[in-house]
């Protein structure tokens, strides 16, 4: 199988946009990939690794400048569901999604991440809802700036407390409830939309896109994937008692695009310590303030959000998208991201099915 020929065939020589999951589904139907349905319902340790072929397939596509850029463009387009829901949100200013809620408050759309029984962890139950919420916030004409924060949780250890998020749901991962494609849909999808906005079909996302500034407010902690998200934000507020970690080594996976983005904030040495040696970064430390723009006492976070919204919108937001594009041109153009994701697609597939991942989950996290 030549993945590039398959991609050109399924996308009609790159004139048709297909999301990662739809692309792989059609490739399975055409006999180019094994059907991962045979592994559905099995715990991770019992899977037959049928999804490894998806990793090799997507790595080859993303490694090609033409096909890879087209796939990145596809994943930056709004979901079909988002275009339908945007109109109702425009009228009501409120929307509920699996794993997230969206509320317009003055000039801001406030997106609250919610998976209360799992410390707001990310999994298959939150993925589509989260991306749809991001789309709707960016599409809303009455919104000038977006705010991202975690909701209150019900987990016994932190019941009633607002938390930013605990990263990937390790229990679901161990139980085999998170597929390999979850990583690619997430990082090519809503996480990249935080950073690049929404693409338009008729023009490169490098040239034109639908963008708004994003403000994050960190209560408690931002672990793993939630720390990765902070690296895409335009402004981050954190509580003084909050902390950040990227326990990728202890989990046994690649931490999204953090290996690409974190060194820009804290330098190579600290980034490697965070990823390879589980360095915990207090938000109120010198290193934490390289990621967090403002650190305040927990009871003052709400006021800090309001103040920041006014600060970023007080003179209008006409240049916000232009400045975001200019920063990206110097820091992370789409082609750099594409090349990183080609490596990520291949390496994460091997990590996801590694016996070491199972061992780490059982030993370090005691999941069942």
What is each PLM-predicted segment?
Residues 1-106, 153, 282-283, 303, ...:
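C-terminal alpha-helix plus adjacent terminal tail
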Residues 111, 148, 169, 229-230, ...:
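Hydrophobic/aromatic residues within transmembrane alpha-helices
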Residues 111-112, 129-211, 215, 235, ...:
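A structural preference for short, pocket-lining loop segments at secondary-structure junctions
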Residues 204-317:
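Crotonase-fold acyl-CoA enzyme core
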């Amino acid at each position: 199988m030549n993945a590039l020929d398959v991609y050109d065939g399924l996308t009609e020589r790159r004139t048709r946009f297909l999301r990662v999951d739809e692309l792989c589904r059609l490739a399975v139907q055409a006999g180019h990939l094994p059907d991962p349905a045979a592994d559905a319902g099995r715990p991770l340790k019992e899977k037959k690794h049928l999804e490894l072929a998806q990793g090799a397939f997507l790595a080859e596509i993303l490694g090609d400048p033409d096909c890879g850029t087209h796939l990145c463009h596809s994943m930056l387009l709004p979901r079909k569901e988002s275009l339908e829901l945007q109109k109702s949100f425009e009228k009501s200013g409120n929307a509920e999604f699996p794993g997230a809620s969206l509320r317009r408050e003055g000039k801001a759309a406030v997106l609250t991440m919610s998976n209360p029984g799992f410390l707001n962890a990310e999994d298959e139950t939150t993925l589509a809802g989260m991306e749809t919420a991001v789309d709707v916030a960016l599409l809303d004409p009455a919104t000038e700036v977006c705010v991202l924060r975690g909701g209150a949780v019900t987990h016994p250890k932190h019941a009633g407390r607002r938390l930013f998020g605990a990263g990937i749901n390790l229990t679901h991962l161990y139980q085999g409830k998170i597929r390999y494609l979850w990583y690619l849909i997430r990082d090519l999808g809503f996480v990249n939309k935080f950073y690049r906005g929404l693409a338009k079909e008729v023009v490169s996302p490098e040239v034109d896109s639908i963008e708004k500034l994003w403000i994050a407010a960190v209560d408690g902690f931002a672990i793993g994937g939630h720390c990765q998200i902070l690296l895409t934000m335009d402004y981050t507020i954190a509580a003084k008692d909050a902390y950040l970690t990227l326990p990728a080594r202890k989990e046994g996976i690649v931490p999204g695009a953090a290996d690409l983005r974190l060194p820009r904030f804290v330098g190579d040495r600290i980034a490697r310590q965070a990823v390879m040696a589980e360095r915990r970064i207090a938000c109120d430390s010198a290193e934490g303030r390289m990621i967090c723009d403002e650190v305040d006492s927990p009871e003052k976070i709400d006021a800090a959000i309001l103040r920041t919204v006014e600060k970023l919108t007080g003179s209008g937001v006409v240049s916000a998208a232009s400045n975001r594009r200019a920063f990206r041109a110097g820091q992370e153009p789409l082609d750099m991201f594409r090349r990183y994701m080609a490596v990520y697609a291949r390496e994460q597939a091997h990590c996801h099915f590694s016996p070491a991942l199972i061992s780490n989950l059982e030993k370090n996290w005691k999941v069942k």
